[in-house]
A protein has these predicted regions:
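A generic fold-level signal
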Residues: 3-5, 17, 78-81, 104, ...
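Conserved Nudix-box catalytic region and its N-terminal flanking loop in Nudix hydrolases
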Residues: 18-61, 159-176
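Unchanged
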Residues: 40-126
């Protein structure tokens, strides 16, 4: 089935006094409490969207961690929406430097322990993502680093290159491909 609206977000988290806390947003227009997320802009990857939306909604600069899955649901308009989520550990200094100010989209931010956060979110699908996060956290599965394997972009044809294959330069299309993927990879640090 096709998805009408694609979005991305993150479970932003930090440890305070030995207890994990996750960040929830109080959305003004929707009058709800949810995980920070937003719609994909044209030409943007899901990872770029997650990073941009967290910055816009919370003022936090984040690096994406472990993928937490996706939520599929229907909007009041009847359109289908899919939101992809990642974990994002927030450096304590970054949390203090956040430039967040209440605005027309987000009325406030709240750091809660997981149990309270699951009870506080308005939508069950946010609770599901938080439960996935909790399982991974409790099983020490969030302390990871990314290993991203990418095949090179389109290279010059072999018949147009005299040097060794490993030194064959990218064609124009390959350079465009490399530029297109850079932002999505940068979201992982």
């Amino acid at each position: 089935r096709s998805i009408d609206v694609h979005a991305a977000g993150a479970v932003c988290w930090k440890v305070v006094d030995g207890e994990v806390r996750v960040l929830l947003v109080h959305r003004t227009q929707h009058k709800d409490v949810s995980l920070p997320k937003g719609k994909v802009d044209p030409g943007e990857t899901l990872t770029e969207t997650a990073q941009r939306e967290i910055l816009e909604e919370t003022g936090l600069h984040i690096v994406l961690g472990v993928p937490l899955g996706k939520s599929d649901y229907r909007l009041p308009s009847g359109k289908s929406k899919r939101v992809h989520y990642w974990s994002a550990e927030v450096d304590p200094g970054e949390a203090e430097r956040s430039s967040f100010e209440p605005n027309g989209e987000i009325a406030g931010l709240e750091w809660l322990n997981i149990k309270r956060a699951i009870k506080a979110v308005t939508y069950e699908h946010d609770g599901d993502i938080l439960r996935t996060f909790e399982t991974l956290f409790n099983n020490n599965r969030l302390n990871t680093f990314p290993v991203i394997v990418v095949r090179h972009g389109k290279a010059l044809p072999t018949e147009k290159w005299d040097g060794p294959d490993w030194s064959r330069p990218l064609a124009h299309r390959g350079l465009v491909q490399a530029q297109d993927i850079a932002g999505g990879l940068a979201a992982f640090g």
